[in-house]
């Protein structure tokens, strides 16, 4: 196979100051070994946040929505959206301690092995004796196929699990898209270091090497020469990367050009944004803006490619985000993700177009009609705050100054002084972000630049390697 692009052959000011435990949890080892193997093992002590003054009789009258796990970026927003629809949110989680806000906000959480479908079905049945369960969903891609299976089992609205599973494997997804004539980068999958070397020689360097299954840019790297390719191959296949499936990597042609993300609900494109990344070899997003500066003709071409992706992959229910780069031959699809992108993307869509993607997803999950009408057109942009080194955060200030700037809509931090910072070239490298909204892109850029320049921090290097190694990043659901 050549390294050519393939055509048919083969992405209110709500100041979450010091949301530290989320970041702290992103820096410790995570294991599911202790998780109960069946719903029967779930104890009363495992069910957190349940209001004690609500009787079982009253519970039966309450409509509930079940969330399978949650995420670092969108999780809290999903809970808030459920409550806005006057539903009772219940999180099923292998590690309830991940969600540090549940106790303070009295959110019900049940401990269950979320990798065990039978255990989840059993827990659903148990909860069904006390609640009128209106729907089941998840913000996490890794559990979305499971959501589809549970919905099918209980005759609830939900995604097609087979389509989701196919889409979540980037190698299988790429094969389907190429067969349907959708422009994609040249690629091959590999399971051994020798295969990686062979495929890279065929495709050519630079090439992108990434896990076939995963999200959040975990394990994704641009390999510009043979040394970088060998190093990253060893990282992925040598036991350092945490796999949630059998080890399989994708070696793909590096496609250069402006990077865009389309946010979709059902089969309707709600908006297309443009993304800027930080320096290679990693793909950590630096800035995202909605709407992207596309001509009408470019927008129509992008929407056409999006629709072809949805049809080829059997998607069309619920949220999808599609990443593509614009090249000399037009849009080339990088990834199709059968979920909403993590915040700040949904925030930006709501600020730009007044469409609440998370709320509309919940409506779909409970069988209600969506309202995807765009009620305004503004420019919304987000800039990431990215640590400049590993170490311990000494201080971070200027948050109030940034938040007070007219046009700043949100300032979110994942850290506070004393938080250990370990960069890994993925979405957890962000220590926070700033969101701004304005009538034009130039105004939004001016506001966001002023806000970011108002924020300052200091990080002291770790004293030794041991200090750094004890803060291995957590495999947070996403």
Curated annotation (Swiss-Prot):
InterPro entries, per database record: ATP-dep_AA_Ligase, ATP-grasp, ATP_grasp_subdomain_1, CbamoylP_synth_lsu-like_ATP-bd, LAL_C2
One Pfam assignment: CPSase_L_D2
Active site positions: 339
Entry keyword ATP-binding: yes
Superkingdom of the source species: Bacteria
SUPFAM superfamilies, A to Z: Glutathione synthetase ATP-binding domain-like
Keyword S-adenosyl-L-methionine assigned: no
One function term, GO molecular function aspect: ligase activity
Keywords associated with the record: ATP-binding, Ligase, Nucleotide-binding, Plasmid
SMART domains: GARS_A (SM01209)
Binding site for ATP: 214-219
Protein name: Uncharacterized protein y4rH
Lineage, top ranks: Bacteria, Pseudomonadati, Pseudomonadota, Alphaproteobacteria, Hyphomicrobiales
């Amino acid at each position: 196979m050549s390294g050519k692009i393939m055509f048919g052959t083969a992405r209110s000011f709500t100041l979450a100051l010091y949301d530290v435990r989320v970041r702290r949890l992103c820096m410790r080892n995570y294991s599911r070994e202790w998780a109960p193997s069946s719903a029967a093992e779930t104890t009363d002590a495992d069910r957190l946040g349940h209001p004690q003054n609500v009787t079982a009789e009253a519970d039966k009258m309450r409509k509930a929505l079940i969330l399978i796990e949650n995420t670092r970026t969108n999780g809290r927003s999903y809970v808030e959206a459920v409550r806005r629809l006057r539903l009772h949110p219940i999180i099923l989680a292998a590690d309830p301690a991940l969600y540090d806000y549940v106790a303070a906000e009295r959110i019900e959480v049940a401990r269950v092995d979320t990798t065990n479908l039978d255990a989840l079905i059993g827990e659903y049945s148990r909860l069904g004796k006390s609640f009128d369960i209106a729907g089941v969903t998840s913000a996490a891609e890794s559990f979305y196929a499971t959501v589809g299976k549970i919905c099918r089992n209980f005759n609830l609205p939900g995604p097609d699990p087979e389509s989701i599973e196919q889409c979540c494997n980037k190698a299988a997804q790429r094969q389907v898209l190429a067969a349907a004539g959708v422009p994609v980068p040249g690629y091959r999958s590999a399971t051994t270091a020798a295969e990686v070397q062979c495929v890279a020689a065929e495709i050519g360097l630079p090439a992108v090497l990434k896990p076939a299954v995963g999200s959040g840019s975990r394990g994704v790297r641009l390999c510009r020469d043979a040394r970088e390719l060998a190093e990253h191959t060893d990282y992925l296949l040598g036991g350092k990367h945490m796999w949630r499936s059998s080890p399989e990597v994708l070696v793909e042609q590096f496609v250069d050009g402006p990077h865009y993300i389309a946010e979709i609900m059902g089969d309707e494109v709600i908006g297309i944004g443009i993304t800027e990344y930080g320096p290679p070899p990693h793909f950590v997003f630096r800035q995202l803006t909605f709407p992207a500066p596309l001509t009408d003709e470019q927008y129509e071409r992008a929407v056409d490619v999006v629709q072809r992706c949805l049809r080829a992959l059997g998607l069309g229910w619920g949220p999808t985000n599609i990443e593509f780069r614009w090249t000399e031959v037009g849009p080339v699809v990088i990834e199709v993700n059968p979920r909403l992108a993590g915040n700040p993307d949904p925030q930006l869509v709501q600020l730009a177009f007044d469409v609440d993607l998370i709320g509309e997803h919940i409506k779909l999950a409970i069988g209600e009609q969506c309202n995807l009408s765009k009620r305004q057109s503004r420019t919304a942009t987000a800039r990431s705050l990215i640590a400049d080194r590993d170490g311990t955060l000494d201080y971070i200030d200027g948050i109030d100054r940034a938040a007070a700037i007219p046009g700043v809509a949100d300032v979110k931090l994942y850290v506070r002084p004393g938080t250990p910072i370990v960069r890994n070239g993925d979405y957890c490298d962000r220590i926070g972000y700033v969101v701004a909204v304005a009538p034009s892109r130039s105004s939004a850029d001016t506001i966001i630049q002023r806000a970011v320049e108002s924020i300052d921090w200091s990080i002291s290097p770790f004293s030794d390697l041991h200090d750094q190694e004890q803060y291995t990043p957590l495999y947070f659901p996403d």
